[in-house]
């Protein structure tokens, strides 16, 4: 992306306390910041699972939910999700629905990079053809949600930690969404 992205730094109450350049923010001492996580579904109710590009600084090559990112100053979370969906997987979305509005996590990847985010979780339906950005996504699969939830429970080490936690906290809402988008 040609525009330099920032993260919005927040305190424990979610109040904005500043901004920082995205790559400078993600270190072994990452400050709490705003993010979002989205689970995208097709009209068959299948979930898009993506494998993070090897060039990603945190969790490279790891399987995760569809699209994640950070809202920018002056941008709503919904606008940020639509922007990142276009950038990462080349799609337009509809029916953007909050699944876990208060989700928060802090995890350390194997290289020592910390993710420390207030990260509301959303589900949405893809309404245009998929065109993945290889700088973001090295592979992807469409999977039945029930199979994915079983895999997350059986082999959590094979997926991003935020995806595992999101599924554990919001599986019923994800199932409901998947059932409702089936054509």
From Swiss-Prot:
The keyword Isomerase applies. Its main location: cytoplasm. It is found in: Cytoplasm. Gene3D superfamilies: Nucleoside Triphosphate Pyrophosphohydrolase. Mn(2+) binds at residues 26, 33, 70, 115, 117. One of its GO terms (molecular function) is metal ion binding. GO terms for biological process: dimethylallyl diphosphate biosynthetic process; isoprenoid biosynthetic process. One of its GO terms (cellular component) is cytoplasm. Binds 1 Mg(2+) ion per subunit. The magnesium ion binds only when substrate is bound. Binds 1 Mn(2+) ion per subunit. Homodimer. This is Isopentenyl-diphosphate Delta-isomerase. It comes from Enterobacter sp. (strain 638). The lineage of its organism: Bacteria, Pseudomonadati, Pseudomonadota, Gammaproteobacteria, Enterobacterales.
């Amino acid at each position: 992306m040609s525009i330099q992205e920032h993260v919005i730094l927040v305190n424990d109450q979610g109040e904005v306390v500043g901004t920082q350049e995205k790559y400078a923010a993600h270190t072994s001492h990452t400050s709490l910041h705003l993010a979002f996580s989205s689970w995208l579904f097709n009209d068959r109710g299948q979930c898009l699972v993506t494998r993070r590009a090897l060039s990603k600084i945190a969790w490279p090559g790891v399987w995760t939910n569809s699209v994640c990112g950070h809202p920018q100053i002056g941008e709503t979370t919904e606008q940020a999700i639509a922007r990142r969906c276009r950038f990462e997987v080349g799609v337009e979305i509809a029916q953007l629905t909050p699944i876990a509005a208060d989700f928060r996590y802090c995890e350390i990847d194997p290289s020592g990079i910390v993710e420390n985010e207030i990260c509301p979780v959303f589900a949405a339906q893809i309404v245009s053809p998929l065109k993945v950005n290889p700088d973001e996504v090295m592979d992807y699969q469409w999977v039945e949600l029930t199979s994915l939830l079983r895999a997350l429970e059986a082999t959590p080490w094979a997926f991003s930690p935020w995806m595992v936690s999101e599924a554990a906290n919001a599986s019923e809402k994800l199932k409901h969404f998947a059932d409702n988008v089936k054509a």
